[in-house]
């Protein structure tokens, strides 16, 4: 852990303004966004699973509110055009998730751990990591996003022995708690800490 904290201290000053700016955007979306805005963000998180944040951002710009109203085949075609690896399946997930429209604002404002579990149980294409990602991107600070970049860092620094092949609730919460302790030692919430980790790995602050 000490070596990771040293690496993070080296980039703290240059990363902090970018992290704070990005988190303000997240909070604004959570506080001022419409149900449709929040649904588009949930769809972004569905798309980034087994793809990339860059691809998800590109799709979000191209499709916009189409996530809310496009017919299934049109949405699948749009995802094909932006190069998604699984356009048909992801389009099916997004269309099925439209049943959650009207519930998202309450989830963002509710208890983050209960909201995350609700999404894991009720949203298609959303697991523990993706639910954490959505809630963090709407201004929730308490959850860790355990993606492959973060897990590789944790393994390299001896925080975990191996990268999990899949997530049960128990396993996710266990690894999240390890990362939470590192975030606390760094003086940041898990949600913001993730952005510092991204900056360390990628040299930029994505969402």
Curated annotation (Swiss-Prot):
Catalytic activity: 2'-deoxyribonucleotide-(2'-deoxyribose 5'-phosphate)-2'-deoxyribonucleotide-DNA = a 3'-end 2'-deoxyribonucleotide-(2,3-dehydro-2,3-deoxyribose 5'-phosphate)-DNA + a 5'-end 5'-phospho-2'-deoxyribonucleoside-DNA + H(+)
GO terms for biological process, alphabetical: base-excision repair
Active site location: 129, 147
UniProt keyword annotations, A-Z: DNA damage, DNA repair, Glycosidase, Hydrolase, Lyase, Multifunctional enzyme
Annotated TM spans: none
The keyword Nucleotide-binding belongs to this UniProt entry's keyword annotation: no
EC number(s) given by UniProt: 3.2.2.-, 4.2.99.18
InterPro entries: DNA_glyclase/AP_lyase_Ogg, DNA_glycosylase, HhH-GPD_domain, HhH_base_excis_C
Site (Important for guanine/8-oxoguanine distinction): 207
Top-level division of the source organism's lineage: Bacteria
Single Gene Ontology MF annotation: hydrolase activity, hydrolyzing N-glycosyl compounds
Role noted for this protein: Catalyzes the excision of an oxidatively damaged form of guanine (7,8-dihydro-8-oxoguanine = 8-oxoG) from DNA. Also cleaves the DNA backbone at apurinic/apyrimidinic sites (AP sites).
Family: Belongs to the type-2 OGG1 family.
Protein name, per record: 8-oxoguanine DNA glycosylase/AP lyase
Source lineage: Bacteria, Thermotogati, Thermotogota, Thermotogae, Thermotogales
Gene of this entry: ogg
């Amino acid at each position: 852990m000490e070596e990771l904290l040293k690496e993070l201290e080296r980039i703290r000053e240059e990363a902090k303004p970018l992290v704070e700016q990005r988190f303000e955007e997240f909070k604004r979306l959570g506080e001022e966004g419409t149900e449709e805005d929040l649904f588009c963000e949930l769809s972004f998180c569905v798309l980034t699973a087994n793809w990339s944040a860059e691809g998800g951002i590109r799709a979000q710009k191209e499709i916009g509110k189409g996530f809310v109203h496009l017919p299934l085949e049109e949405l699948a075609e749009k995802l094909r055009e932006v190069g998604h690896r699984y356009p048909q399946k992801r389009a099916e997930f997004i269309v099925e998730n439209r049943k959650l429209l009207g519930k998202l604002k309450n989830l963002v404002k509710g208890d983050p751990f209960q909201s995350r579990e609700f999404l894991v149980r009720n949203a298609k294409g959303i697991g523990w990591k993706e639910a954490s990602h959505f809630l963090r991107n709407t201004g929730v600070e308490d959850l860790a996003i355990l993606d492959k970049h973060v897990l590789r860092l944790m393994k390299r620094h001896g925080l975990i022995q191996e990268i999990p092949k899949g997530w049960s609730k128990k396993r996710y919460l266990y690894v999240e708690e390890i990362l939470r302790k590192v975030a606390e030692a760094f003086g940041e919430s898990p949600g913001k800490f993730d952005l510092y980790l991204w900056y360390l790995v990628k040299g930029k602050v994505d969402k």
